[in-house]
């Protein structure tokens, strides 16, 4: 049980509640609870590719990776267990779609850490779900309610749009830099001498903004965009299409599904796992980069200045350089 997150631990206090239910798990699930959960039937939808990879050997066809679950996946379930994410817009997006697939009186359970903002769930869903707090423990809350009426879900209305010079950007809720180009990415883009050439990997690409802008400036590059999140990948595909750019989009847990080498790997890596600071992704990105770079290839990363990139880069490459910086961010580069 120690490997389970606090929201999953609070759910386990109510296992009898689910024994005869057909359950679909969705939302910000961050552990393997569905593999050991006691219910009549268990299905899982996840936007996270690494969760799909871990759970699919056990759940087979009863787990689905994608932006949203299919009607077929939810068709034989009668109960929703939704893990509240830290992004309210993402929660609303996913729950609105989920609720649109179920008949009225469907049972909805919502669980999450208090600091994630789960307290807003009751008001956010008031029109469609009558929620009440069922339990509170481990700084988490569990809400329960029944679907009162199905919402009307419109996928097209979920997209957010902005422009970076002549590049059009589209993003789905929950994807990094949803409303504007973030400061770190701006600094990273400013560090490049255009035009670029060769094979380029935009790793943990988010909406693919970095790769899309660089490909627009240097159309001769052979671009690959990768991310672990389905909404990020869908946003990347949309941005490539709207800007008429050809590139490959790959679901991958860092390098898990990327066997080849590149002339340049670039990234603005996240350093949070859910609500907690976690640099394991950063460590893995740097440690495994040499296996994915040609000789003379470069790893270029932007990061908050306080993160331990110098130590990590020195440990793997034996050297690094700071190409540019401001008060908050630094752009690092290491060459194989």
Swiss-Prot record:
GO terms for molecular function: 16S rRNA (guanine(1207)-N(2))-methyltransferase activity. The keyword Transferase applies. Keywords: Cytoplasm, Methyltransferase, rRNA processing, S-adenosyl-L-methionine, Transferase. InterPro entries: Mtase_sm_N (IPR013675), rRNA_ssu_MeTfrase_C (IPR023543), RsmC/RlmG (IPR046977), SAM-dependent_MTases_sf (IPR029063), Small_mtfrase_dom (IPR007848). It catalyses: guanosine(1207) in 16S rRNA + S-adenosyl-L-methionine = N(2)-methylguanosine(1207) in 16S rRNA + S-adenosyl-L-homocysteine + H(+). GO terms for cellular component: cytoplasm. It is found in: Cytoplasm. The keyword Transferase applies. Its EC number is 2.1.1.172. Its main location: cytoplasm. Specifically methylates the guanine in position 1207 of 16S rRNA in the 30S particle. HAMAP family: 16SrRNA_methyltr_C. Belongs to the methyltransferase superfamily. RsmC family. Monomer. This is Ribosomal RNA small subunit methyltransferase C. The gene is rsmC.
């Amino acid at each position: 049980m120690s490997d389970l997150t606090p929201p999953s631990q609070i759910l386990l206090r109510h296992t009898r509640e689910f024994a005869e239910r057909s359950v679909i798990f969705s939302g910000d699930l961050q552990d393997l609870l569905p593999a050991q959960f006691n219910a009549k039937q268990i299905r899982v939808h996840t936007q996270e590719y690494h969760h799909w990879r871990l759970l699919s050997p056990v759940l087979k066809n009863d787990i689905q990776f994608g932006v949203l679950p299919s009607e077929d996946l939810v068709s034989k379930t009668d109960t929703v267990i939704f893990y509240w994410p830290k992004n309210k817009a993402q929660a609303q997006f996913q729950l609105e779609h989920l609720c649109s697939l179920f008949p009225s009186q469907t049972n909805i359970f919502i669980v999450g850490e208090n600091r994630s903002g789960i307290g807003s769930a009751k008001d956010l869903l008031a029109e469609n779900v009558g929620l009440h707090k069922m339990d509170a423990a481990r700084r988490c809350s569990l809400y329960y309610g029944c679907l009162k009426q199905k919402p009307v879900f419109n996928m097209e209305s979920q997209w957010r749009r902005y422009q970076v010079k002549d590049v059009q950007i589209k993003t789905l809720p929950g994807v990094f830099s949803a409303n504007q180009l973030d400061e770190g990415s701006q600094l990273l883009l400013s560090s490049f001498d255009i035009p670029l050439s060769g094979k380029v990997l935009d790793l943990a690409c988010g909406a693919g903004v970095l790769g899309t802008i660089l490909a627009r400036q240097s159309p001769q590059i052979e671009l690959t965009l990768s991310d672990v999140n389905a909404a990020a990948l869908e946003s990347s595909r949309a941005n490539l299409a709207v800007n008429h750019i050809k590139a490959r989009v790959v679901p991958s847990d860092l390098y898990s599904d990327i066997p080849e080498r590149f002339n340049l790997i670039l990234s603005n890596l996240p350093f949070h796992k859910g609500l907690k600071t976690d640099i394991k992704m950063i460590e893995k990105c740097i440690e495994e980069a040499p296996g994915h770079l040609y000789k003379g290839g470069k790893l270029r990363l932007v990061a908050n200045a306080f993160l331990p990139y110098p130590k990590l880069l020195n440990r793997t490459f034996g050297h690094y350089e700071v190409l540019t910086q401001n008060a908050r961010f630094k752009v690092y580069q290491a060459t194989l």
